[in-house]
Regions:
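Helical membrane-embedded segments and adjacent short helical loop/helix-boundary regions
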Residues: 1-21, 31-39, 43
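Transmembrane alpha-helical segments of multi-pass membrane transport proteins and ion-pumping complexes
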Residues: 13-17, 21, 44-56, 75-79, ...
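Helix-loop-helix hairpins and the membrane-proximal interhelical loops
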Residues: 21-24, 28-33, 56-57, 80-95
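Conserved small/polar residues in nucleotide/adenosyl-binding loops
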Residues: 164-170
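Hydrophobic, well-structured mid-protein blocks that either form specific transmembrane helices
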Residues: 29-81
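Membrane-embedded helical hairpins/re-entrant loop segments and their flanking transmembrane helices
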Residues: 25, 60, 108-121
Length: 174
């Protein structure tokens, strides 16, 4: 296989691996649609706002701000967000990896410190903040939490795209 073809070969099984638990838990996920959407909206807001706050506090320029603001969504979405504003896409990819790996490593401690024990809270937190890497980590222990995390990851990405395109131009003019 040449270049990234092996990744494309593994993408199909990876999608099925995430989709099967969604199918199994579909009735509960439908019942939780409103809290899932609200949690994803909050997660997307916190993800973008925390990235912007850190970058502005550090005095970074707009190109870096755009990249850091997209840290809590999946890499393809982060690259599109960053690219659409003229940011540094490779930095966006690195920030996404840091957020994902950080969440996958630290989630147990964070959940314990903040007393997060519900499947909904754990899934929403990981899907919104640590995207696919965090979702895969949760899936090891609980298909339900992994399913919630998958929905949160997708919804947060859609909301983050909308949020960044509606707010970043205004925020950076100030």
């Amino acid at each position: 296989m040449i270049g990234g073809e092996w990744i494309n070969q593994l993408l199909g099984p990876a999608v099925v691996a995430l989709a099967y638990p969604l199918y199994i838990h579909r009735s509960l996920l439908v019942k939780l649609a409103v809290p899932l959407f609200a949690g994803a909206a909050a997660g997307a807001f916190v993800g973008v706002a925390s990235g912007l706050s850190m970058a502005k506090w550090a005095g970074f320029g707009p190109e870096i701000l755009y990249a850091i603001s997209a840290k809590s969504v999946t890499t393809p979405v982060a690259v599109v967000i960053t690219e659409s504003f003229g940011g540094i896409t490779s930095l966006a990819a690195v920030m996404v990896m840091i957020a994902g790996i950080g969440g996958a490593i630290l989630h147990t401690y964070i959940f314990r410190i903040f007393g997060i024990h519900s499947h909904l809270g754990r899934g929403m937190g990981m899907g919104s903040a640590s995207h696919a890497i965090g979702t895969a980590e949760l899936m090891k222990d609980s298909q339900l939490e992994g399913s919630i995390s998958t929905v949160a990851m997708v919804a947060s990405a859609v909301i983050a795209v909308s949020y960044t395109h509606l707010t970043l131009p205004t925020i950076l003019r100030v």
